[in-house]
Amino acid sequence: MMILTNGRIYLDGAWKTGLDILVEGEKIADIQSRGTWKDGRTVDVQGRYLAPGFIDIHIHGSNGSDVMDAREDSLENISAFLAGNGTTSWLATTMTQTIPRIQDALHTVSEYMQGKSHKGAQILGAHMEGPFINPLAKGAHVEECIIPPDQKTFEEITAETPDIVRLMTLAPERESALEFADYLKDRGIVVSIGHTKASYDQCVCAMQHGI
């Protein structure tokens, strides 16, 4: 048990003082008036600001490393950099690339998550940004690798990492996109609209499918 004291705590939309934070394990267990708890290791944060860690759900890389490197040391470097800047967990985000390259990246994320205890921000899973997007809104994605939404292709990509994808960016105006979104939702994957040329009406329809 650890007690964080003498900090400026962001709570209920405002910065507050005169409060202590009780930490049990890796979670905030309680927040009470200063001096409520007498037992436990007390850490004086000397007036620093205390706020919940950020969760970054869309990040391809940082500090010279990229998720598509498909290397655990790259993920370690990204995680360490994020933690040093207030982000405590993140979704490793892939780019539109060849199927083997996406598979390699997802496999590396899976191995990293199942491996030894790591320092830095925690990887919660993967965010697949593409390849099921609109080539007319490709941005930095490789146009030659963009493909229509397809359940079989997704299952091929994730055959060895079936539970690693937590979020999918999808262009809902593409053929079969809504059926594909229903399939992803049934698997517990959050679907987000992105890299799209969808109209307002198409977006409203997509929202009715849980996107």
Predicted features by range, described:
Residues G40-R41, Q46, A105-G120, V204-Q208:
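Short amphipathic alpha-helices and their capping/turn segments at secondary-structure boundaries
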Residues M1-W37:
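N-terminal metal-binding scaffold of metallo-dependent hydrolase/deaminase domains
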Residues Y49-G64, H127-G139, E175-D182:
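N-terminal small/glycine-rich loop or linker at the start of catalytic domains
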Residues G7, I21, E26, G47, ...:
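Divalent metal-coordination and catalytic microenvironments
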Residues G61-E72, A140-I147, V190-G194:
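Active-site mouth loops of central-metabolism enzymes
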Residues Y112, I147-I211:
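Histidine/acidic residue-rich metal-binding segments in metalloenzymes
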Residues H60, E76-A105, A121-N134, T161-E173, ...:
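Divalent metal-dependent hydrolysis catalytic cores, especially in the metallo-beta-lactamase
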